[in-house]
Structure formats: structure tokens, C-alpha cells
Amino acid sequence: MLTCIQPSSSSIGGFGKADDNVRILLMASVRNEFGDTSIFSRLGVTALGQHYVLVTKKKMFGGYTTHMITANMRNRPFISIPFKVSSGAQSIEESRDLISRLTTVLGRPGMFSFDDPPIGSQFPVGKELIQLDEVPVGVHDRQDKYLEKGDEVFCEVNVSGVKFYHSGIYAGDGMCYHFVCDAQESESFADALAVFSGASAHVVYDTWFEFVYALVEVSDVPPKIFRASHPLICRSGEQVVKYAEHLQRELENYDIRRCNCQHFSSECSTGVPFSYDMTSNFKYLACTVLKPTSTVVNAMTRPNRDRSSFASSSTSS
């Protein structure tokens, strides 16, 4: 889902009377999505200020499941699709109990990561749930107008005719954390193959310009930028950035299919390493069978060149 967003608000929730409107829209979504199968629902607000509703749904052939719908005022549309949060079939009492536990945990500072959810619950991370909102081109001049600290940011890249995204974590004040291969000293087949099977790499703390142009050449037309988000925001911006700093000391090997920049940014945001691009069978196959020529390698590695030249390029563009 690709949409265009406006300058960011200071909160993912509503303000004043807007809170009432958000709750009304959430309950309208419950009626539209579940109809008569909705047996019980409870509205709530997370410790991070995000409105949500938890729903007990009656299954067609018996039993119940628990689902969630959230609101994020920074997204368009800002009401999420419903997603299941129970780990299996339940009785109605079990569903109500899970809703009570989740309501309590979601209201606590710190909340939880998706890799360690409360007992009986699950929070899937998949392409069908991740929303990409296109950020106005003005973000290249004024990052803090359109982004918030801890945002997961995708930069559109074209590799040998295949569209990929280079991702990172916006750290505020025009700086980003992102995961890239170390510069290759040669263009040998062995060095090229390493990018696909495990190459030396590290998390770097870069200016916005260096992040955006880490894998593409500088041109008069800047690449498209997207903000990626899961329906449930489980970490504050500060927590996301701190986790990026933690991974800066931990990550050392890059594998385009199993440990790439998107795995890094997803783990920072949700606790679960996930690659938006590698869910595509076509892209996964392309990265598996595509001959790793120097063209591909140069697109996947951090260029071994004088980065100071970027400053003059940025000023002149």
C-alpha cells in the first residue's frame, strides 16, 4: 500500500475531540470488518498514545479468535486493516482474558517487542501489514518537517532493472542509521558472491544525504522516500534509535536474502528482523540466480570513495 503523507504531527494519536472521532472510526471499522461475528470489543490507548480496538470474533465452525485494529494519525489511511493477535483458537472466556492482558500490557511504558509478545498472543510482521507512505520530496531539504526520530525510512533503488528499497532508521537532526556492506577493494567474482552469501558489513551513522545516496548515484531527481510502519507501534522513537545503536555494535555480516538493511531497520522498529523486498518470490529468485556482476555489487555495497565529494554535490544540486 503506497500513499502520500503530509508533514508529520507530533503524535500518532488524536488531540482533544479528535480522540472521540478516532474511537468512532475504530468502532465503525469493527462493524464493517466483522459484522455479526464481533462478539466483544474493547477500545484502548497504548502507552505511546496510539488508539486501538481489540475484538473477539466468532469463527464460522466454532471457537473464537482475537483481532486488533489500530489508528495512526500519521498514516493515510490512518485506520489499519484488522489483524489477528491470538495464537490459536480460543473459547470466548480465553479471548476476553487475552484482551484484558493485552490492554494492561499495552498501557505500560516500554510495552513489548513482537519477538516476545504476551502469552497467548502473536503480532505478525509481514508485507501485507507493513504500510509504506510516500514522503513529499521536500524531505530532502527539511527532514524534521516530515519525519520523526525513530522512523523506519525506505529509499527507492533500482538494481539491474529491479526495484528495491534501501532502508534505515531516522535518528533526528538529519542523521540516519543504516546497514551496508563494507566497500569492496576488487570486482572479483568471489567478492561479488560474498554480497549474496555473507559479506563484511556494519551499521553506519550517516547524514541524510549519505544515507539516501549510499546505493545510488547523485542526480537532479532525488529518489523517492517512504516511511514504513506496522499497524501497532510497539517502540518509541527513542527506543528505536537506541536499538539501532545497539545493533551498530552487533551486526557484522551482510546477506542480501537473510540479513540485509531491511532486516536491520525492521528489528529496530519491531524486534523482528524482516525484509519487505525478500517476501517477493521474484526478487528473492533474482537475488538467488542473478549473476553477481560488478554492477550488482556496486549497487549493494557502500562505495569506496571520498564521501566529502557529496557535500559539494548536494550544494550544487
From Swiss-Prot:
Keyword entries, A-Z: Acyltransferase, Cell membrane, Membrane, Transferase
Tree of life domain: Eukaryota
Tissue expression: Highly expressed in the cells of the spermatheca, the mouth, and the lining of the pharynx, the rectum, and the excretory canal. Also expressed in the pharyngeal intestinal junction cell.
Topological type in the membrane: Peripheral membrane protein
Effect upon mutating H178A: Rescues the egg-laying defect of the egl-26 ku211 mutant
Pfam families recorded: LRAT
Effect of G150E: In ku228 and e1952; vulval morphology defects displaying a connection of gonad defective (Cog) phenotype where there is failure to make a proper connection between the vulval and uterine lumens
Gene Ontology molecular function: acyltransferase activity
GO biological process annotation, one example: embryo development ending in birth or egg hatching
Subcellular localization: Apical cell membrane
Predominant location category: membrane
Record GO cellular component, one term: cytoplasmic side of apical plasma membrane
Coiled coil, from the record: none
EC numbers, comma separated: 2.3.1.-
Family annotation (Gene3D superfamilies): endopeptidase domain like (from Nostoc punctiforme)
Active site: H166, H178, C261
Domain LRAT, first and last residues per copy: 156-277
Class of this enzyme: transferase
Function: Putative acyltransferase. Plays a role in the morphogenesis of a vulval toroid cell, vulF, which is located where the vulva and the uterus connect. Not required for specifying vulval cell fate.
PANTHER family, per the entry: EGG-LAYING DEFECTIVE PROTEIN 26, PROTEIN CBG04856
Protein name as it appears in the record: Egg-laying defective protein 26
Encoding gene per record: egl-26
